Design a protein with these regions (language model features):
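PLP-dependent class I/II
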Residues: 1-285
Length: 285
């Protein structure tokens, strides 16, 4: 993501993005002095939804780049294929870049994979799709990812890689090679375990008085509104002192995340049960 922002974004370039979103993308845009126009997801009837007409109308001739993270961190929201098609057609017509972060593409609970813009793309589209081994293969921290991009960008990306990461160490390449050879087994087991952990967590959350939430169809986060709080960072600090459980404050994911908390459920069942038992007195008053 940082490489792409270095390549595309410059002073005052307008970037349209959907929030709440992983904070590093916002930081990468601001480091290049880009201007962010954020369209916020809304929680309606237990589902995260976007005002899609508002999104399309926000992407104009002034827009340099549109950023989509689907499935999304922190919400688990997935952009439907029909919306992907309409958005891609819109950016194609305007000639702006569409960046799709699809690192949770295989972490889904109702389908084998989530919809990808690559299924709709044409060779000359100004489309860049980002993926990673971190989520699908439990290789977080190995910093192995890949970019699907138009041929014209190849030499420019290579130059940026040369002065940043240079290359992937051989033993990490071997690990990824093994993961790719066994990807069906690995991702099947991962999804099965994550779904079990998700269900344990949300069987509690949906019944807590102070919590309003959506059960995610993808990724591995619970992102929920806590009724009555307007400073999620302060509340998260208090939770650590009261329960010894660390959660991510929603404001870290942008202004639209304020009043929410995020918990990762990529953990063993016994661990999930323990943290929910600790959190219940604070969130189910």
């Amino acid at each position: 993501l940082r490489l792409i922002c270095d390549l595309i974004v410059s002073n005052n370039d307008e970037v349209v993005m959907i929030g709440p979103v992983w904070p590093n993308i916002r930081s990468s845009i601001l480091l290049k002095k880009g201007s962010i126009k954020e369209i916020s997801l809304e929680l309606k009837n237990g589902e995260w939804v976007i005002d899609f007409d508002l999104l399309l109308n926000s992407v104009t001739a002034k827009t340099k780049m549109v950023f989509v993270n689907s499935p999304g961190n922190p919400t688990g929201w997935v952009m439907p294929k029909e919306q992907q098609k309409l958005l891609l057609n819109h950016t194609r017509h305007l000639g702006c870049w569409l960046i799709s972060d699809e690192v949770y593409h295989q972490i889904t609970f109702n389908d084998f994979v989530s919809p990808s813009f690559l299924e709709l793309s044409k060779p000359n589209d100004r489309l860049i799709v980002i993926n990673s081994a971190s989520k699908s293969f439990n290789m977080t921290g190995w910093r192995i990812g890949w970019i699907t991009h138009p041929e014209e960008l190849g030499s420019h990306i290579a130059k940026l890689v040369q002065i940043t990461t240079t290359g992937v160490p051989e033993f990490l390449q071997n690990g990824l090679g093994s993961a790719l050879e066994n990807h069906k087994t690995i991702t099947y087991e991962l999804r099965k375990n994550l779904k079990k952990s998700r269900d344990i967590m949300f069987n509690k959350l949906v019944n807590w008085n102070q919590v309003e939430c959506s059960i995610p169809d993808a990724a591995f986060y619970a992102f929920f509104k806590v009724k009555g709080i307007n400073d999620s960072l302060d509340f998260a600090k208090k939770l650590i002192l009261e329960t010894n459980v660390g959660v991510a404050p929603g404001v870290a994911f942008g202004a639209s995340g304020e009043g929410h908390l995020r918990i990762c459920f990529a953990a063993k069942d016994t661990f999930i049960i323990e943290i929910m038992d600790r959190l219940e007195p604070a969130l189910n008053k």
